[in-house]
């Protein structure tokens, strides 16, 4: 199954995000440990086209439980970059592209 993860940063998270960026990238590289494959991932940015304000992932996984475990172990989640309760996980049906 394909899932989309939508996670918005806390308003004051820019420094925390930067501090945990390398660990977050390593987590993405290690996604197979959680039974998920990252199709694409990247930050949402502010209108200045530079300042990160959240994260978007499109991943493949056998089920929502694997996705949830992957998200909850992400350094951005464990270190409070993302808004509490602000992470959404949705199943996705690819129709084009």
PLM regions: where:
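Conserved, structured core segments of small domains
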Residues: 1-97
């Amino acid at each position: 199954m394909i899932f989309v993860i939508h996670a918005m940063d806390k308003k004051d998270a820019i420094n925390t995000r930067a501090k945990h960026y390398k660990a977050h990238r390593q987590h993405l590289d290690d996604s197979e440990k959680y039974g998920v494959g990252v199709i694409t991932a990247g930050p949402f940015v502010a209108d200045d086209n530079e300042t990160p304000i959240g994260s978007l992932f499109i991943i493949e996984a056998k089920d929502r439980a694997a996705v949830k475990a992957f998200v909850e172990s992400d350094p951005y989640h464990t270190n409070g970059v993302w808004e509490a309760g602000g992470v959404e996980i949705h199943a996705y049906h690819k129709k084009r592209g």
